[in-house]
Amino acid sequence: MIDLEVIHRVQATLVERKGAAPDSSYVASLYAKGTDAICKKVAEEAAETIMAAKDGDRLHLVREVCDLWFHSLVLMSHFDIGVDDIMCEFRRREGISGIDEKKSRPA
């Protein structure tokens, strides 16, 4: 079972950094650059995750997924979306087939 506490602690740190000076931390500098820069970083980390998966190196994949999750958390925080919001959506989808879930989405 995943320890969500560490993710909540990371999220709390990210929220704190939203108001920080851009030169005070990497995350504060990302927030200052705005949505496009954050999205670009998420896309970069997603591509690196895919490449690590194709390489078949488990440790490299774990590290890239961690980077992807981290930058996804930055993006979520940027839009005031918390870990609990995502967990609620997972709970909502639990037990629903992917096909049925997609059909339930607005067009």
Locations of regions flagged by a protein language model:
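Flexible "arm" and connector segments at domain edges
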Residues: 1-65, 69-107
